[in-house]
Swiss-Prot record:
It comes from the Bacteria. Induction: Expression is up-regulated in colistin-resistant clinical isolates (GKK-1 and GKK-3) compared to colistin-susceptible clinical isolate (GKK-2). One of its GO terms (molecular function) is hexosyltransferase activity. It comes from Pseudomonas aeruginosa (strain ATCC 15692 / DSM 22644 / CIP 104116 / JCM 14847 / LMG 12228 / 1C / PRS 101 / PAO1). Its main location: cytoplasm. This is D-rhamnosyltransferase WbpZ.
Length: 381
């Protein structure tokens, strides 16, 4: 069975949570007999077809980028051709231009939307886009949310309860590198035996300014991995607050990231807005058996991190509450270790890539069977 995935960006040209989810979905469902192809936009689409892991990436030229939305003229032809060869089309939402491609190409294959996030920030544009969005979501056969938390709190998904399913994101730990002893010793010597860790892009919804405010007047060692548009602003904030034990490492490679995950004491994840729909790096912390601190924003973060079991969940945008949670974990190492074990057990139970691949392959086959059944009914009339 061939599945066509469609999203505006993809690895390795851009690295983000959605791209990583698509990769894990393609690789994990591939072991269940799914032939995955990804169509995406690229500023340099040469070569246009690239084998990537166990799947294939097709690239169309990016002609225009406006309000985080990529546009392309050539993608209409490529999508029409690739969709004709596919058994199922898997759209990755949100991307308004994708909706146009869906309708203007007359796509009539079984279709599913992976609903990664509500549209949060572009509220003015959302008013213009809403009629098209509603028509698009109404037209597809299934919608998939990544957590029951997000499904129950999304005003959009509430309108499509009958066709919406929940399949959580999953990670393959075996696919992560195993850091060399020298690499581990390097970071242990540089950072010390215990530190809190944040991993992620420095975006507006990540709440890093809240984390820095929470550290004022404390000396907890905190390691921040990642870069992004707020980098200079956060550096300035840390300096203004006189924070001497915050280590900004910028981007690191995967081996260094795993080394830091293994060595860390606990994960801090201060995202305070619903734009943080799941939290892949939070799940990575659980995968490596770390207790977590996150905020209650009604999304998948509180499906990964269960308060009092795998870590602590605090109200969003409250530095004092975040500071108190950090203090509690720091002063209760035995309980923190137990929470870390619980976090890893929860990952193994719910969030493995194998489980994600199995459930998605079942959904794809269900869609094909429904299509075949509807054709049979029509032919019998």
């Amino acid at each position: 069975m061939r599945v066509l995935h469609f999203y505006k960006t993809y690895l390795s040209e851009t690295v983000g949570g959605i791209e990583q989810v698509i990769f894990q979905l393609c690789e994990s469902s591939g072991s269940w007999g799914i032939d995955n192809h990804v169509l995406t936009l690229s500023s340099d689409p040469h070569p246009p077809v690239v084998p990537f892991g166990g799947h294939v990436v097709h690239r169309a030229r990016l002609d225009l980028q406006l309000a985080s939305t990529g546009f392309s003229l050539s993608v209409f032809k490529q999508f029409r051709e690739l969709a004709a060869e596919a058994d199922v089309v898997n759209y990755h939402f949100p991307w308004p231009f994708m909706d146009l491609v869906h309708f203007l190409t007359g796509m009539n294959k079984p279709s599913v939307v992976t609903y990664h996030s509500d549209i949060i920030r572009q509220r003015v544009l959302l008013k213009l886009y809403r009629p098209l969005m509603s028509r698009f979501l109404h037209s597809v056969d299934r919608i998939v949310a990544a957590s029951p938390n997000y499904f129950s709190t999304s005003d959009v998904l509430r309108q499509y309860r009958e066709k919406t399913r929940v399949i959580t994101y999953g990670l393959d730990k075996d696919g992560y590198p195993k850091p060399a002893t020298q690499r581990l010793e390097h970071w242990r010597e540089k950072l010390g035996p215990r530190f809190f860790l944040f991993v992620g892009v420095m975006r507006y919804y990540k709440g890093l300014h809240i984390l820095l405010d929470a550290l004022q007047g404390t000396d907890y060692p905190v390691v921040i991995v990642g870069a992004g548009p707020l980098q200079a602003e956060l550096y300035a904030q840390a300096a203004a607050l006189g924070l001497r034990n915050v280590h900004f490492l910028g981007r690191v490679d995967d081996e260094d990231k795993v080394a830091l995950l293994q060595l860390s004491y606990a994960m801090v994840f201060p995202s305070h807005l619903r734009s943080e729909a799941f939290g892949i790096s939070l799940l990575e912390g659980a995968m490596y058996g770390k207790p977590m601190i996150s905020s209650e924003i009604g999304t998948g973060t509180s499906y990964i991190n269960i308060h009092g079991e795998t870590g602590l969940v605090v109200p969003p945008s409250q530095p004092a509450a975040f500071r108190q949670a950090m203090r509690w974990l720091w002063e209760h190492p035995q309980q923190a270790e137990e929470m870390g074990r619980n976090a890893e057990a929860r990952y193994r139970q719910l969030f493995t890539a194998e489980e994600m691949g199995r459930r998605w392959s079942e959904l794809y086959r269900e869609l094909l069977e429904e299509k075949a059944s509807s054709r049979y009914v029509k032919a019998a009339r």
